[in-house]
Regions:
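A short acidic, glycine-rich active-site loop
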Residues: 56-71
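General small-molecule cofactor/ligand-binding pocket signal
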Residues: 38, 89-93, 144
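Small/aliphatic-rich secondary-structure junction motif
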Residues: 2-55
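Structural beta-alpha unit
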Residues: 2, 75-113
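Glycine-rich, Arg-bearing micro-motifs that act as flexible, cationic patches
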Residues: 112-134
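Short, hinge-like loop/turn segments at secondary-structure boundaries
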Residues: 52-56, 107-108, 131-132
Length: 149
């Protein structure tokens, strides 16, 4: 078994993601591991049929989304509690969630991904597949899917 030293926790700020972060922090305590808390902002369509956003508006929206996400991650860390001996590194990426999660797994040498087992349901999930499903299928490390309580 590979030693767990780097744990990635993707978050969408739901109570389910809170549970995943709590689980990751407990595992980090046991293994003296780092926790990487990641939020991925999906790239939005900037043009509709008759209207496009200008670059300044897009840049402002991006900046505001990143700042808001960073603030929400700090609140999430405070909510679940962070032991002094566990390092939690939070950051935001922009892109397709499952793709960014998989890139981070490679780039940060992640040994374990802990994420909420929830998300899209019904027809959309059936047609597209959930983020958790895609990550579990394609990750090169173990993935722990945490169910809500």
């Amino acid at each position: 078994m590979v030693a767990i030293k780097n744990i990635l926790v993707p978050t969408d700020f739901s109570k389910f993601s809170d549970n995943a972060l709590k689980q990751a922090v407990e595992m980090a305590k046991q293994n003296k591991a780092k926790v990487y808390l990641l939020h991925v902002i999906e790239v939005v369509q900037t043009c509709a049929v008759y209207y496009c956003l200008d670059q300044q508006t897009i840049n402002t929206l991006d900046k505001n989304s990143i700042k808001s996400s960073e603030d929400m991650m700090q609140k999430q860390i405070k909510k679940v509690g962070s032991p002094k001996d566990i390092e939690i590194i939070s950051y935001v990426k922009k892109g397709t969630p499952y793709e960014e999660i998989l890139k981070e797994q490679e780039g940060k040498k992640i040994n374990l991904i802990v994420m909420a087992a929830h998300g899209q349901t019904g027809l959309i999930s059936h047609l597209l597949g959930s983020v958790a499903d895609k990550v579990a299928r394609h990750a090169k490390c173990p993935v722990l899917l945490v169910k809500g309580k």
